[in-house]
């Protein structure tokens, strides 16, 4: 081990996603195998016992890279000196609750967490919001963190990206590692737009290998609604796959993608007609610790419609929480 210790915060630490996520972090899957880590676990008071039990198991796993664990119900403690934060904990939608109610309820979680990050985190802080509705929760946290650059707040759409890659690999009977330039535009919701326009497998255009009706009638809705499908089959929401995708996102953000495209939900700079500031899924590459939107792509009317639908959806979400954006 040659590098200084990195502090990594995880909220919702007693939950199912965190239970998979924390072991990957402790194993060195975010910063690498030469970087020791400290884990800072945040939970609500009612679930602090669960988080303490998770910490006990982490200690028992004797990870060489894991140097310390803090368990707390105070955001200012969890985010003290934090270099990377996974904001996983969020309020699930209750029976009969509208999406606007859910947005407001989560705003009361992510606003204070954004402020606590602003006041306590390290200068190189990177924040990935996993808790849903992730794009708008990230927007709320970002607005509350006035001194942190906006591009340090991302929402997780890597799960959607990975789901799309897996479905294409299965359909084509080809190695998923050969798939390039696939992207999911927009919101982490059932309205997202998985796009194969530029995607290739082993250098071949995927759009020429699959039927258009399959693409629009099966692939797009299956990727967009995969979470609901898993709940139907498993009886619980996606947890391990969400954790794995969160690791993928943060690892690539920090370490780069070697020019390969990844889907990342980041603050828009106005590219492709997406209003500046919306946290939106784009085709990106990571270089020097920053996501950069792939530029100068030609868009068909079909693509423009898919992007526009997501812009409308995210603008409506932003309007619903405008009082929380300060």
From Swiss-Prot:
It catalyses: (S)-malate + NAD(+) = oxaloacetate + NADH + H(+). GO terms for molecular function: L-malate dehydrogenase (NAD+) activity. It comes from the Bacteria. It is an enzyme of class 1 (oxidoreductase). CDD domains: MDH_chloroplast-like (cd01338). Its EC number is 1.1.1.37. Keywords: NAD, Oxidoreductase, Tricarboxylic acid cycle. NAD(+) binds at residues 12-18, 106, 113, 130-132. Substrate binds at residues 93, 99, 132, 163. Gene3D superfamilies: Lactate dehydrogenase/glycoside hydrolase, family 4, C-terminal, NAD(P)-binding Rossmann-like Domain. One of its GO terms (biological process) is tricarboxylic acid cycle. The active site is at 188 (proton acceptor). Belongs to the LDH/MDH superfamily. MDH type 2 family. Catalyzes the reversible oxidation of malate to oxaloacetate. This is Malate dehydrogenase. The gene is mdh.
């Amino acid at each position: 081990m040659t590098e200084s210790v990195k502090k990594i915060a995880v909220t919702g630490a007693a939950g199912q996603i965190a239970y998979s996520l924390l072991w990957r972090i402790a194993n060195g899957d975010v910063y690498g195998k030469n970087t020791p880590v400290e884990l800072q676990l945040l939970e609500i008071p009612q679930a602090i016992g669960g988080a303490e039990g998770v910490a006990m198991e982490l200690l028992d796993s004797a990870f060489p890279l894991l140097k310390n664990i803090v368990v707390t119900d105070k955001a200012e403690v969890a985010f003290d000196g934090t270099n990377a934060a996974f904001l996983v904990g969020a309020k699930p939608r209750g029976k009969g609750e509208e999406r606007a109610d859910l947005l407001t309820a989560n705003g009361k979680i992510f606003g204070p967490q954004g402020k606590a990050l602003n006041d306590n985190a390290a200068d190189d802080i990177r924040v990935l919001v996993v808790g849903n509705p992730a794009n708008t929760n990230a927007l709320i946290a970002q607005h509350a963190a006035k001194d942190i650059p906006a591009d340090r707040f991302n929402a997780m759409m890597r799960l959607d990206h990975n789901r799309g890659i897996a479905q294409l690999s299965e359909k084509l009977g080809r190695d998923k590692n050969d798939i390039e330039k696939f992207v999911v535009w927009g919101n982490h919701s059932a309205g997202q737009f998985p796009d194969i326009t530029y995607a290739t497998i082993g250098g071949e255009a995927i759009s020429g290998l699959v039927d258009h009706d399959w693409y629009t009638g099966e692939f797009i809705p299956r990727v967009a609604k995969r979470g609901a499908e898993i709940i139907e089959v498993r009886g619980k929401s996606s947890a391990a796959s969400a954790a794995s995708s969160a690791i993928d996102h943060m690892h690539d953000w920090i370490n780069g993608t070697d020019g390969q495209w990844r889907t990342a939900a980041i603050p828009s700079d106005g590219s492709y007609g997406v209003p500046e500031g919306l946290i939106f899924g784009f085709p990106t590459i990571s270089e020097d610790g920053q996501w950069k939107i792939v530029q100068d792509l030609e868009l068909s009317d079909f693509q423009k419609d898919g992007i526009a639908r997501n812009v409308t959806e995210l603008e409506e979400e932003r309007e619903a929480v405008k009082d929380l954006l300060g």
